[in-house]
Amino acid sequence: VFGVRGANGVILITTKRGETSKPVVDLRASFTMNTPINLPEKLGSYDFARLKNEALMNVGEVPEYSAYDLEMYRTGASPYTHPDNDYISDLLKDVTTKQQYNLTVRGGTPFVRYYVSANYVHEKGIYETFDNNDYDSNVYFKRYGMRTNLDFNVTKTTIFGVDLSGRLEERHDNDAGTDLYQSMVRLPPNFLNYVNPDGSYGGKLNAVNPYAALSKYGYNHSKRNVFEAVVKLNQKLDF
């Protein structure tokens, strides 16, 4: 019930119920594709280094990058010593998907009316997955749900109702937390290597290697089961 204290009445929300009729079956399915919007466009290492040199010279300071550095960034000839990373493009998917299915059956006889529904939702996250992982580095959410509403006409004035509902929710998250996306947005493109020549992950103090965070930080996987039952008795008191 919404708006109990309002001046214009209330809004009463009730669950769907069966009706006296032949069985009516309804199946609905949807498949959607989602893409992120308003992602920042990052400079490449060459433009970043060139503009940083220009900014330093504008305030009378010595440029940070030499002509050799600029040439290495421009040509990409030495990716380990002069990396050029596009964290957002490399680590986020362009498109992710969501599936949703819902099946309902309703009907009834003069004695019993029924409404039965089942649903399934699967929504995938936006992070890339990698072959060197022994777990899924992406995030996802799954939900399986069911509902059964039964109304029995015990007598002409007595209705006995049973409402059963349940759902299973499954969540999978990588363990990098909010630092992961912050690193993608804030780190300069030449700040670190994803992977060093010896196979170790690149990194510096006070910085998160977003590739390593996705690949090796681990994951959280949780399941939640919910079941609800409501029993009702409606007796008309006609005198």
Functional labels for PLM-detected ranges:
Residues 2-234, 238:
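Membrane-proximal, glycine/serine-rich, low-complexity loop/turn segments characteristic
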